[in-house]
Regions:
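Intrinsic disorder/low-complexity segments
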Residues: 1, 12-14, 413
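Sec-dependent N-terminal signal peptides
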Residues: 1-7
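N-terminal periplasmic/intermembrane-space "pro-region" immediately following the signal or transit peptide
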Residues: 7-102, 254-260, 442, 447
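Short linear motifs centered on Gly/Pro in flexible linkers and helix caps
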Residues: 15-16, 31, 190, 393, ...
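General helical structural elements
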Residues: 25, 37, 56, 61, ...
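Outer-membrane beta-barrel pore domains
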Residues: 47, 113-115, 159-161, 267-447
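Outer membrane beta-barrel
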Residues: 79-231, 237-274, 334-365, 372-377, ...
Length: 447
């Protein structure tokens, strides 16, 4: 009996020990399963990361291949950017296209003696300009397309030029005449909102022909042979005209030629003086000739002298011009002259105040209404919203004329007053009215 009980105790002890081992083994198996599951997850994540890396690598190679294909289709490649205008240029720098634009939005008010006042908005200038060079930088070109205030498009500049190693150049096509310096300066770089009445009467405007010149650091020489004043956008067939302009400019001081391309001078600008002299002469077979220099003439000759002085935040500019127009059929001869002086001063980096006075005379001319003389005084302000940038400019000026402004032909002779126009905002005075006020405010955008 005691033996049986002892055996049973031994069996029970052995069974209890075996259960503990089983539980330990089960716990170990469970832990191993967890470890295996964790290892599997880590393996899957590693595989997914490798798969993503392969996909990204494949995508990058595809993009690079496409870029290389596009690059090869463009020949030697193209550079693009903005430097005084948006441009495209070949990698060898032998081909370049630059795109610029000009937009002038203007409101004006004109109050003339004995007439109803007039006011309104206009798009004074809307231009898109293409320029650059082809073959190599010595072959340059410029095409300027404009849209008129009354609708329709037009062309101002359209020329091809060649530069030579000796600082000489030649140009053919349609371009500005280089007689009056006020007209030579771009409309986007003037001091006032628009050109003066003197400029309106004596400028040649845009012409067709050929021109050549030479320059160094201090001297600029020009000669132009054209079809005469305002001969742009015309054809070759018709009455013949021979017109010559010769101009010389002399520069002194630290300011460069490009600095004198502006009639304003910002704070920090270099000092300089430019003196210019020019001569014009034309003869035409056109019946009645042209209206130029306050005369209807088939022959004309004239001269001008101008001076531009600029410094650190200030500028002065003035010129005098005189022409003689002949009608060879009737024998009439008309002398006319004009002069202008103006100056500006930067109050700070954004504001400029300016004044201007202009005067003109049509010698011994008699008009049905209006005077043979012209004079006007102007004050104004320029505002550049962005310091150091010329892309945006707001100009406001107000002027008063002191003489009765004539327009058109004289009672006798070949005189023809040409002071006024819709471009500058002045009107012909009627009934010998002698007081006129002109207010202009203009926002300009350049790109």
């Amino acid at each position: 009996m005691s033996i049986s009980i002892g055996a049973l105790v031994l069996v029970m002890v052995a069974s209890s020990s075996q259960d503990d081992k089983i539980q330990t083994l089960q716990k170990l198996v469970h832990e191993l399963r967890e470890d295996v599951a964790e290892l599997k997850n880590q393996k899957n994540e590693t595989w997914l990361n490798q798969q993503r890396a392969e996909e990204i690598r494949s995508l990058v190679l595809e993009v690079l291949s496409d870029a290389d294909t596009r690059y090869s289709m463009r020949g030697d490649g193209v550079l693009a950017g903005y430097d005084g205008g948006a441009y495209l240029m070949s990698l060898d720098e032998n081909w370049k296209l630059k795109i610029n634009g000009q937009l002038q939005v203007r409101w004006l008010y004109n109050n003339a003696d004995r007439q109803a006042s007039q006011r309104g908005f206009e798009l004074r200038r809307t231009k898109v300009i293409f320029s650059g060079y082809v073959v190599d930088p010595s072959w340059t070109y410029k095409i300027a397309a404009t849209w008129g205030r009354a609708g329709g498009s037009n062309t101002e500049d359209a020329w091809i030029a060649k530069k030579f190693d000796n600082n000489q150049w030649i140009r053919a096509g349609q371009f500005k005449a280089w007689f009056l310096r006020e007209n030579i300066i771009s409309s986007s770089k003037q001091l006032a909102a628009n050109g003066s009445m003197v400029n309106n009467a004596f400028t040649y405007g845009w012409v067709q022909g050929v021109s050549t010149g030479w320059n160094n650091e201090d001297v600029n020489l020009f000669v132009q042979f054209t079809d005469g004043p305002w001969s742009f956008n015309t054809n070759a067939l018709g009455p013949s005209t021979n017109a010559w302009i010769a101009r010389a400019e002399f520069k002194f001081g630290d300011a460069g030629w490009s600095d004198f391309g502006y009639l304003t001078s910002k704070i920090g600008a270099k000092d300089g003086l430019l003196i210019g002299v020019a001569y014009e002469n034309y003869n035409t077979d056109t019946a009645g000739g042209f209206e130029y220099g306050n005369a209807n003439a088939d022959e004309s000759y004239g001269w001008t002298i101008d001076a531009s002085l600029r410094g650190d935040g200030w500028n002065l500019f003035g010129y005098v011009v005189e022409t003689t127009g002949k009608d060879t059929v009737t024998g009439f001869e008309q002398d006319s002259s004009g002069w202008l002086i103006q100056g500006g001063f930067m109050v700070n980096n954004n504001y400029e105040l300016f004044v201007q006075y202009q005067n003109g005379e049509i010698n011994n001319a008699v008009f049905a209404t209006g005077s043979s003389e012209m004079s006007a005084f102007r004050i104004g302000i320029n505002y550049w919203p962005v310091t150091g940038s010329n892309n945006l400019k707001w100009t406001t000026d107000v002027a008063w004329s002191h003489d009765s402004l004539a327009d058109g032909g004289t009672v006798t002779g070949n005189g023809s007053a040409d002071w006024t126009g819709t471009g500058n905002g002045w009107r012909q005075d009627i009934l010998n009215g002698d007081g006129q006020m002109l207010l202009r405010t203009q926002l300009q955008l350049l790109f």
